[in-house]
């Protein structure tokens, strides 16, 4: 069953076509003035301009045709040519029934579902994740959930940073501490121990030590450069260490990502495509796209139509090494060649400050024919800022670790729950579980509710509140609906068939009707805040419904059964939508 808005749009489009006008003028949406109408169609004004006719005349004829539609209670012309529509109680009742029993809670699969790779996360091996990783993780994971739900075949890839200078820092610092390790014997080629010689704590100590030394000593930095060059060239001991570093890091990363309910299909890194680079470079040469410049190999990607400077892609630098341009291109090649189903598009959820890099890479990929340039999308986002409007930092001015941010969220969630009226029989384990869900809801929703491309100010006290536009508020709204249904069941009352008769019921069903449009809008525009807005509106509509009408306490049995069924539909859509945002709802709180 399609949404009422979509159904009415199709009917209005057909009415415009019957008048010899384009169907696109028939778009119907929720009314800006709910006191006057449920839906509105504004297409008559644009159609009149195109046809050279009076807009009210066109609107009048369209309204007359729409009055014949089974769902329409009234169709009236207002102002210069607006068409105001009221739908029948029967149509709303049928729609609510469908939402309640539908696996997609009233949404529909996308007509343009595609095989999609979503590249997000981008954590670095041996480096702790920081607050800057929050947005990529949360936005990327939400997009993969939304896209899968809408019918896309999605493969998500964390795309680890495991091939840069930090690897050289680790190797050399480990050598300084334990020079006798077999990995440093250049004459030895294996086999190497299965157990890593380092822990995640070791990596967290070794890297900053080496990095600080390298910043103060050019010779020390040169040692790291030499070590990473030897690693990239295939030195067995260093490659074995790399595998250990990656293995240890992934275990730790899975904990950080897991806390946020973030998952990946692939845990690949830059090093996984190293073997493809020589062949890739040769392809660029054979295609006549690569040329030498000051000892480096570059690809010009600038176009005459460019209105900004577009530097060339650096395939191979003057020292013979490769960088992010090359590994990103090799990763595209790897995905196109090795994934079970060939990708039709790739989305890169990365800080918008990397826009130039991705534009260069996408152009080069298109020029070589790896994939059409317009099938590659950079999903950029703004920064997480402190109260001063600058990127969020610790009190000491350092970068805040993601694990510390999560601990802060847990502490604030516990504080909020301590002030709440929790069930007396709630044990420590359940309380901890609820606190974690509140913390995750706060972190994820506070990020997702903002337009992706904007910066936002991080305010943990506000984000963990059970009031206002927050994740915990939406979670509590869903729990409250579940509580109403549970208590009704305990008193022997069950849901029946939805029969809409009251204004508060109508408003609630009209909000339920918009879920599919919000879902597909969030998917199409890569903007999760669209779904957040819908769910917040639904929670508010239920709150108004709950305040206006008795539900389980309704004396009339049929009305009670109807309202319980409507509440169950709200529960279903709220939980479904929150799951798409990566927010789990507890049974009680």
UniProtKB/Swiss-Prot annotation:
InterPro entries found in the cross-reference section: Arg-tRNA-ligase (IPR001278), Arg-tRNA-synth_N (IPR005148), Arg-tRNA-synth_N_sf (IPR036695), ArgRS_core (IPR035684), DALR_anticod-bd (IPR008909), Rossmann-like_a/b/a_fold (IPR014729), tRNAsynth_Ia_anticodon-bd (IPR009080)
Pfam families from the UniProt entry: Arg_tRNA_synt_N, DALR_1, tRNA-synt_1d
Keyword check for Acyltransferase: no
EC number(s) recorded for this UniProt protein: 6.1.1.19
Domain of life: Bacteria
Enzyme class of the recorded protein, top EC level: ligase
GO terms classed as biological process: arginyl-tRNA aminoacylation
Catalyzed reactions per annotation: tRNA(Arg) + L-arginine + ATP = L-arginyl-tRNA(Arg) + AMP + diphosphate
Subcellular location, record wording: Cytoplasm
Single GO term (MF): arginine-tRNA ligase activity
Keywords from the UniProt entry: Aminoacyl-tRNA synthetase, ATP-binding, Cytoplasm, Ligase, Nucleotide-binding, Protein biosynthesis
Any Gene Ontology CC annotation: cytoplasm
Keyword ATP-binding attributed: yes
Cross-referenced Gene3D superfamilies: Arginyl tRNA synthetase N-terminal domain, HUPs, Isoleucyl-tRNA Synthetase, Domain 1
Motif 'HIGH' region per UniProt: ranges: 123-133
Family statement drawn from the similarity comment of this UniProt entry: Belongs to the class-I aminoacyl-tRNA synthetase family.
HAMAP family, A to Z: Arg_tRNA_synth
Subunit structure: Monomer.
UniProt name for this protein: Arginine--tRNA ligase
Organism listed in the record: Hyphomonas neptunium (strain ATCC 15444)
């Amino acid at each position: 069953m399609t949404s009422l808005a979509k159904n009415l749009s199709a009917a209005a489009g057909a009415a415009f076509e019957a008048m010899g006008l384009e169907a696109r003028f028939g778009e119907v949406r929720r009314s800006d003035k709910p006191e006057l109408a449920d839906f509105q169609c504004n297409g008559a004004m644009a159609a009149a301009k195109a046809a050279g006719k009076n807009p009210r005349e066109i609107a009048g004829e369209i309204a007359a045709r729409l009055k014949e539609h089974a769902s329409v209670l009234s169709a009236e012309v207002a102002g210069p040519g607006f068409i105001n529509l009221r739908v029948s109680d029967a149509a709303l009742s049928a729609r609510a029934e469908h939402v309640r029993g539908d696996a997609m809670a009233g949404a529909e699969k996308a007509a343009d579902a595609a095989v999609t790779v979503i590249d997000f996360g981008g954590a670095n091996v041996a480096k702790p994740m920081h607050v800057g990783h929050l947005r990529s993780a949360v936005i990327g994971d939400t997009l993969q959930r939304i896209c899968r739900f809408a019918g896309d075949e999605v493969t998500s890839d964390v795309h680890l940073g495991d091939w840069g200078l930090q690897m050289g820092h680790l190797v050399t610092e480990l050598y300084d501490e334990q020079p006798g390790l077999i990995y440093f014997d250049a004459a030895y080629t294996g086999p190497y121990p299965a157990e890593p010689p380092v822990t995640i704590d070791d990596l967290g100590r070794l890297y900053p030590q080496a990095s600080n030394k390298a910043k103060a000593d050019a010779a020390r930095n040169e040692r790291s450069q030499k070590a990473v060059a030897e690693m990239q060239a295939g030195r067995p001991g260093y490659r074995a260490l790399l595998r250990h570093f990656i293995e240890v890091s992934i275990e730790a990363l899975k904990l950080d990502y897991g806390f946020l309910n973030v998952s990946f299909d692939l845990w690949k890194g830059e090093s996984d495509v190293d073997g493809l680079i020589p062949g890739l470079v040769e392809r660029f040469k054979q295609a006549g796209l690569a040329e030498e410049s000051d000892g480096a190999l570059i690809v010009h990607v600038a176009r005459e139509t460019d209105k900004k400077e577009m530097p060339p892609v650096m395939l191979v630098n003057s020292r013979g090494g490769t960088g992010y341009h090359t590994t990103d291109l090799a990763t595209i090649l790897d995905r196109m060649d090795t994934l079970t189903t060939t990708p039709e598009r790739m989305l890169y959820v990365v800080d918008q400050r990397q826009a130039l890099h991705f534009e260069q890479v996408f152009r080069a990929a298109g020029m070589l024919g790896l994939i059409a340039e317009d099938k590659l999308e950079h999903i950029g986002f703004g920064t997480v800022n402190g109260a001063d409007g600058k990127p969020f930092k610790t009190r000491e001015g350092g970068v805040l670790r993601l694990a510390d941010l999560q601990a802060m969220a847990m502490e604030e969630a516990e504080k909020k729950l301590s002030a709440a009226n929790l069930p007396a029989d709630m044990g420590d384990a359940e309380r901890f579980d609820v606190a974690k869900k509140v913390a995750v809801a706060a972190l994820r929703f506070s990020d997702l509710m903002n337009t992706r491309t904007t910066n936002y100010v991080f305010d943990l006290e506000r984000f963990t509140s059970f009031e206002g536009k927050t994740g915990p508020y939406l979670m509590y709204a869903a729990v409250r609906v579940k509580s109403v249904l549970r208590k009704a069941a305990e008193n022997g009352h069950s849901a029946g068939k939805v029969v809409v008769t009251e204004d508060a019921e109508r408003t609630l069903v009209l909000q339920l009707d918009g879920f599919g449009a919000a879902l597909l809008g969030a998917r199409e525009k890569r903007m999760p805040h669209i779904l957040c807005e819908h769910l917040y509106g639904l929670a508010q509509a239920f709150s108004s419904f709950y305040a206006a009408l008795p539900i389980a306490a309704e004396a009339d049995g049929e009305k009670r059964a109807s309202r319980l069924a409507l509440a169950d539909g709200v529960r279903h859509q709220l939980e479904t939508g929150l799951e798409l945002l990566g927010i789990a709802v507890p049974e009680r709180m």
